[in-house]
Amino acid sequence: MGITIEAMKMIRGEAAVAGGSRTKEMVLFGLFTALIAIGAFIKIPVPVCPFTLQLLFTTLAGLILGSRNGACSVGLYVLLGLAGVPVFTEGGGPSYIFQPTFGYLIGFIAGAWLTGWISERSGDFSFGKTLFANLAGLLVVYLFGMVYVYIINNFYLGTPIGVWPVVLYCFVLAVPGDICLCILAAM
């Protein structure tokens, strides 16, 4: 059921020949930055690990905008939040880097880039290949997020946490919903 290669090239601007492609690129940057910010506030309450729709929009940014533009769009979202615009789930500002969840924001940038990079190189936007790209990006997001949670809790906040509790609470309990978002983004 996946999207056609021609349609994806048109969306990414690869088929554009002249003039408005830079404007189109800027509009798509802004659109995905706004969608990610909106996704931060669409919370789906589940026990222990409520999740947001940010992952859906960061994944789609990588798929639709490509590796460079997708990562830049997510990076713009993070920069806006660090500049004080309250676009993160718990507000914004430079002190947000001390929040345990900040690693996931860094992971969103890397995950969008990897998702876009894999989809660009596959040359085929079938469901299976797109899902593979999405899951690879998801793993990168979780890698950055879990490492950051461990480091910030143990070395800055002074609330020691072991590796296994981080894996349990930040991966095992949280990943099923995000896998569903990866499947949704691949459709």
Provide a role label for each language-model segment.
Residues 72-80, 132-136:
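Central hydrophobic cores of alpha-helical transmembrane segments
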Residues 3-17, 24-31, 38, 95-143:
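Short helix-perturbing small/polar motifs within transmembrane alpha-helices
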Residues 124-187:
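Membrane-embedded alpha-helical hairpins and interfacial helices in multi-pass inner-membrane proteins
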Residues 2-73, 83:
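Hydrophobic transmembrane alpha-helices
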Residues 40-50, 78-111:
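Interfacial aromatic-anchored transmembrane helix boundaries in multi-pass membrane proteins
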Residues 35, 39, 43, 61, ...:
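Alpha-helical membrane-inserting segments
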Residues 50-55, 92-100, 161-171:
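Non-cytosolic membrane-interface motifs at loop->transmembrane helix junctions
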